[in-house]
């Protein structure tokens, strides 16, 4: 269970929670590997909208993500086509960043990233839009 989180108290909670310590079924493994195959395909990469803001976060000590190499590879593959792609890697953190010892920092970083995008959307909405097609050239005050 140590691979999941850096917080010893949460490690104990995970170890004692039957919903976290169950054995994966053959079907679950099949579905997981099918999903992994799809999200690593050229088809999937081609379907990701270029304007979609993406933030990848990972713990550098997460064995599931190959110690942040997996996240970095996906981000590198998307970086040429994406207009807003960010990567944040956390030293000494593992798989579940939101239950680790640095969770307050992670939550603050997520909130900052989200607020930056909301501020950008709000600024764009406040910018007057010119309606040229209707004959009148008034500012469109869409909200």
What is each of the regions a protein language model found here?
Residues 1-19:
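Alpha/beta-hydrolase-fold enzymes
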Residues 25-46:
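Active-site nucleophile elbow and catalytic-triad environment of alpha/beta-hydrolase enzymes
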Residues 48-54, 83:
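Short, proline-enriched alpha-helix->beta-strand connector loops that line the catalytic pocket
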Residues 56-58:
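Short beta-strand/loop motif that positions the catalytic acidic residue
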Residues 60-63, 93-94:
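Acidic beta-to-alpha connecting loop that harbors the catalytic carboxylate
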Residues 63-73:
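Conserved alpha/beta-hydrolase "acid-adjacent" motif
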Residues 84-138:
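Catalytic active-site module of serine/aspartate enzymes centered on a nucleophile-bearing elbow/loop
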């Amino acid at each position: 269970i140590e691979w999941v989180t850096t917080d010893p108290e949460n490690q104990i909670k995970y170890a004692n929670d039957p919903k976290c310590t169950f054995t994966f079924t053959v079907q679950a493994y099949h579905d997981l590997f099918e999903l992994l195959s799809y999200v690593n395909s050229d088809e999937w990469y081609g379907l990701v909208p270029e304007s979609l803001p993406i933030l990848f976060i990972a713990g550098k000590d997460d064995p599931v993500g190959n110690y942040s190499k997996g996240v970095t590879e996906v981000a590198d593959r998307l970086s040429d086509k994406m207009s807003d792609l960010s990567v944040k890697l956390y030293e000494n953190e593992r798989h579940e960043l939101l239950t680790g010892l640095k969770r307050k920092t992670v939550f603050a970083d997520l909130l900052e990233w989200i607020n930056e995008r909301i501020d950008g959307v709000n600024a764009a909405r406040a910018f007057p839009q010119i309606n040229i097609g209707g004959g009148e050239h008034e500012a469109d005050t869409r909200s």
